[in-house]
Amino acid sequence: MAFQCQRDCYMQEFDSCVVSCVPAELKLENNGRKEKLTGFNVKLKDTILFPEGGGQPDDHGTIGGVPVLRVLRQGPDAVHFVSSALEEGQEVHIKLDWERRFDHMQQHSGQHLITALADTMFGYKTTSWDLGRQRSSIELDTATVKPGEMEALETAVNEKIRAHVPVTVNLLSIDDPAVEKVRSRGLPDDHAGPIRIIDIEGVDANMCCGTHVSNLSHLQVIKILGTEKGKKNKTNLIFIAGNRVLKYAEKSYNIEKSLTVLLKTGADEHVDAVDKLQKTVKRLQKSNLTILREMAVLIAQNFKSKPDRGHFFSLHNKDGDNEFMNIVANEIGFQDTLIFMTVGDEKGAGLFLIAGPENIVTEVGPRVSELLQGKGAGKAGRYQGKANSLVKRAEVEALLKERSYKCTAGDE
């Protein structure tokens, strides 16, 4: 069965009828967090909302004013997930999120065009593709591409766009001999009905369920951003098409303007300016590390030179690191001195180190880790780790100081 969205990819509003509405759950991932939503699966007599398939994401839109959160294909049906129930038999008005749909059409038709010409020009077969949110990728069945090939391919695809090549949809029966001549990666196991062929006149005929432009001129332009190493003996071609190219150009220009202000150089000198800055930063970091190490030694020597230094040492250094803390601890020696050190933001996250008599460190380590909302581990008289909050540093210091006094009193 072909849906209305496949018969007319440019239709943005449509009236249909609710065939069924049943309670359902939808699992979503929002900013890396998994969510489970309760709602309803709705089947319509027909739909202009494309169900996910053929490498193309589903459409967004509304049914009777109710937002559609997901559209999936189940056999010959499109299942729309909505948050509110709709009555069976109810006549409903469907509105399509056209900006999202047209973007998908541009990327998908762009993929067909690139796939066809990469094959005819260089013999590179497409094994899979991915329509991403910001850029798309085509997996080519080749370990490497030769210099100049992607530039030639980009020129060729944009020549076809400027030539206003028509794109048509043909429906063939599964036993039609013409089916054997089209590009295909196979049909879903639950496919029913005629075979849908996307025909780019004189360029390609490809079996596909997705939504496509009616003329290559609607792609506007294709930019091949480059290639990346893919799976074994594969190469990923990265591209953007249509409005994404305009957004990419706008974003790139805004970044260029900002860098010009920050670097105080023209765009042609940005790379050299950043290279010089990186070398300067690397040199300063090396110098800073040397100073920090020397300071650690001096801090330890200063503590050891005090006749009344006692058996407890505590220090916080905002700019230190694990190496800094360990240098101080090693210089002081922790066989008979309990050492507590932290680095980082005093009211935020950081690192901590406890060093001293092994029995004491083993006893207090987990408690210190708990107070600093962190995680640590230790052995041989050291316990160190990451602190998610150093707010209770003073409380930890008091705890360790008291423990060191008890130990000293016990020894005496």
UniProtKB/Swiss-Prot annotation:
Annotated Zn(2+) binding lies at: 108, 112, 208, 212
Gene giving rise to this polypeptide: aarsd1
Protein name in UniProt: Alanyl-tRNA editing protein Aarsd1
Keywords noted in UniProt? Cytoplasm, Metal-binding, Protein biosynthesis, Zinc
Which cofactor names does the annotation list? Answer: Zn(2+)
Cofactor binding remark: Binds 1 zinc ion per subunit.
Q: Report the source organism.
A: Danio rerio
GO: which molecular function terms? aminoacyl-tRNA ligase activity; ATP binding; metal ion binding; Ser-tRNA(Ala) deacylase activity
- Enumerate the Gene Ontology biological process terms: regulation of translational fidelity; translation; tRNA aminoacylation
